[in-house]
From Swiss-Prot:
Signal sequence extent: none
Active-site residue numbers: D8 (nucleophile)
Protein name: Mannosyl-3-phosphoglycerate phosphatase
Pfam families associated with the record: Hydrolase_3
Pathway as given in its UniProt record: Carbohydrate biosynthesis; 2-(alpha-D-mannosyl)-D-glycerate biosynthesis; 2-(alpha-D-mannosyl)-D-glycerate from GDP-alpha-D-mannose (MPG route): step 2/2
Lineage: Archaea, Methanobacteriati, Methanobacteriota, Thermococci, Thermococcales
EC number: 3.1.3.70
Length: 243
């Protein structure tokens, strides 16, 4: 049996931006034989930072399901996707340039602040992010994060123009017609080509709900509720009940 666990990062795997608290979690999941898949709103560059720090070498899903990054030669069969130096990339979202074109049309009227029109100092203030991680977060490929706005109707306007607006732990994300669940389902289908799969997911936000819908067992950290997910206080509690 192949055991796959999809993990949100912010407020799920790590409480803040420091990867150190996640080290015992990753170590225990590896000991239990899990394939660990980060499924986060974070960019490829951000996730590569955490993958390196935590020694995780499995596929990962970036920017709210916008792209699946599969390390070359990870699966023993051919995968259709865009090839880079290190990955086969299955793209489900739209290019960030398309999103930013629309945001530029709206930013003044709606008072919108996002990565591309914010300074490094503003981003640090909005997010609490350490300065050294800001450049990684700014390497956006398929989405933008909305930090501030003056009029609520910006969400409806972008939705009417064909974009998806998703609420995360703290901010809104604007991306294409994709979500964490669609991407997780595609990746699970690839794993099933290797044999029977048992799937799990852990998250804390509304953007994790589509991911919960496609796995066998889901865990929700915090006070939100989802009909399929078991509420837990932390990811450490998850480790106590999964094998």
């Amino acid at each position: 049996m192949i055991k796959v666990i999809f993990l949100d990062i912010d407020k799920t795997l790590i409480p803040s931006y420091d990867p150190e608290p996640a080290e015992p979690v990753i170590k225990e999941l590896k000991r239990k034989g899990f394939e660990i898949v980060f499924n986060s709103s974070k960019t490829r560059a951000e996730q590569e930072f955490y993958r390196e720090k935590l020694d995780v070498k499995t596929p990962f899903i970036s920017e709210n399901g916008s792209a699946i990054y599969i390390p070359k030669n990870y699966f023993p069969f051919e995968i259709k996707g865009r090839e880079t130096k290190d990955y086969i990339v299955i793209e489900l979202g739209v290019k960030v340039e398309e999103i930013r074109r629309e945001l530029r049309k709206l930013e003044d009227a709606y008072g919108i602040k996002y990565y591309a029109n914010s300074t490094k100092e503003e981003i640090m203030e909005f997010t609490g992010m350490p300065e050294e991680l800001v450049p990684l977060a700014m390497e956006r490929e398929y989405s933008e994060t909305i930090f501030k706005w003056s009029r609520e109707s910006w969400k409806r306007t972008l939705s009417e123009r064909g974009f998806t607006v998703t609420m995360g732990s703290r901010f809104y994300s604007v991306h294409g017609n994709c979500d964490k669940g669609k991407a997780a389902k595609i990746l699970l289908e690839l794993y099933r080509r290797l044999g029977p799969v048992r799937s799990y997911a852990v998250g804390d936000g509304y953007n994790d709900f589509p991911m919960f819908d496609v796995v066998d067992r889901a865990f929700l950290i915090g006070n939100l509720t989802h009909e399929k997910a078991q509420n837990v206080s932390s990811i450490m509690e998850v480790l106590e009940v999964i094998e």
